[in-house]
Amino acid sequence: GRNGWLDRIPAYATRVVQDERTKDFTAQFWIPRPFDWSDDTFDIARHDELLIYEAHVGMAQERPGVGTYREFADRILPVIARDGYNTVQLMAVAEHPYYGSFGYHVSSLFAPSSRFGTPEELKGLIRRAHELGLAVIMDLVHSHYVRNLNEGINELDGTDHLYSPAGPAGDQPHWDSKLFDYGKPQVEHFLLSNIKYWLEEYRFDGFRFDGVTSMLYHHHGYVAFDSRDRYFDEGVNEGAITYLSLANRLAHDLRPSCVTIAEDVSGMPGICFPQEEGGVGFDYRLGMAIPDYWIKQIEEVPDEQWDIREMWSVMTDRLPGVKTVAYAESHDQALVGDKTIAFRLMDKEMYTHMDRASENLTIDRGMALHKMIRLMT
């Protein structure tokens, strides 16, 4: 071009590595032998009810440093299965330049993160999970992408509107990232082919769609949903609804038992309704009000005033016919500028009295309430 040559990573690169010396990311030509899936006939449909363990491969190890796919397969998966879970939800699968983003500032949507190992080692992790009877769900980030030019797809053709709306409309200011323009054919093709790729090449059993609320609305959900009009006015991103409907149709056409979960806090009607009834087609919605409720109880309400009827009401507050993933906490509460339920309950006492030889009322209370919260949820 007029300004000289510029090296960029292809949008569809399936292997991206970071140079240890320069720290630059580059695409790698990667053509391995066909992966041996052996007798992998696993089907998530065998599980009537999902018991989901959320995990980050890099942070799952006890040792200092970044964990690997192999370590996770050998050491962590057997523990998850032994503890009674039947599904693993993996964070930070697609490549991302900033490790501290927990995988949510994605740069290469088709490349599994090389920090944790090779693509074949990720496939080995999924094969091992299936051998243990565990389904594997990918935390899929199609709500935004990293604004970095060197590592990502931003301004890939020299403009700011190849994959995004032009100008400020293409920015997600709350997340310091770029938005997709779901009304563009090249965006639909890019993202839908990404879903097909992860399902067929890696045999994931489903997806948790991250940031669905941000996708559904041009205001990204930063308003009070105080009337029904909020779900049907000009703030709704119709292109995103079309894309999410196509995504669900494709995923379920490719694999009828595929599980799709929507991270939506707005309560958009129809998000989990069948497409034959005019819905978007998600199988589950995340029960995002539940963790906030437990935090409020712990921080603001004395133990003796916890109301069992109120707890039951919050746990069962959902639209008729909408299957909901209930959870006490996730990375949003435990990692992203917050703290775990256990730390809220036991605080600094955890560092000195988490052993059977110590008698400590703070620890005893914390453990009892922690068990009760998990049981209720």
Language model regions located:
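Substrate-binding/active-site clefts of carbohydrate-active enzymes
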Residues: 17, 40-52, 56-236
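Short acidic, gly/pro-rich beta-turn/loop elements at beta-sheet edges
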Residues: 6-9, 63-65, 100, 219, ...
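A broad, low-specificity signal for short, low-complexity segments enriched in glycine/proline
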Residues: 11-20, 97-99, 167-170, 283-292, ...
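Conserved alpha/beta catalytic core and glycan-binding cleft of carbohydrate-active enzymes
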Residues: 203-205, 223-377
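Glycine-rich, flexible loop/turn motifs
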Residues: 5, 98-100, 105-106, 112, ...
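Generic low-polarity alpha-helical segments
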Residues: 1-2, 198, 377
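The feature marks proteins involved in alpha-glucan
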Residues: 1-53, 59, 64
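Charged, low-complexity, helix/coiled-coil-prone segments
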Residues: 9-24, 63-76, 131-144, 182-195, ...
